[in-house]
Amino acid sequence: MKVLQLALFILLPAFASAQKPAPVCKCPDTTFVSSAAKPLKIFHFSNGRSIGLFGYEETKLITGKTLYSEFVLSECGAKKVIDFWGAVLTCDVTFANDTVYVKTLYGFPVGRAMKPEYLPWTIERIYFSGGKAIRKLMINPAIPKYTPAQVAMVFKQYQQAPNENSDATIDLADKLLISTMSGSKKAKYLLVNFKNKFTTLDGAPAEAYDTIMRMLGLWEKM
């Protein structure tokens, strides 16, 4: 037994020196994230390639869950990043079945009493095929829809809403978006012409409305 232990002791350094060092994953030079930034995550693919996530963590939005904002994804060793997700986006980034999933979250008014609930808006899959990184984007098909009674309630809220530049006004626009996605043509008309009624939109609420309209445009394309 002592002879075997001695042999293993002698061979271990040889095995250790033969192992390949862990791949170094650095962020390419970019205006989005410092090239000195260390990856928050590294996703290792079965073809031997890896993708690093560089940026900032968000831990307060959903209790017990680490999300990411203002970050890039880059293949380790590449000179260019795959893409950049800005500070206005909060994403859940996971890895399964040799695929990186980037889920962009949004506070949809689909919770209890139509309260906002953070759910994936878009889901992007990033994987390798034929040596190339492939990206496929889709809208989350599981976003809850409104019942006809809920849509009618949104219309009533619209009629009673004051012309003010507020979060409540944008909450109403969010509800019109869900009503539109639930099949209401009237809701789409009201949403598209939203500024005709709410003429005071400015600053952050105006930017939020523009975001909702971009979401509507993407939903119509998909």
Where are these regions (language model features)?
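Bacterial Sec-dependent N-terminal signal peptides
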Residues: M1-V24
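Exposed acidic/polar residues on beta-strands and adjacent loops within beta-sheet cores, strongest
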Residues: Q19-M222
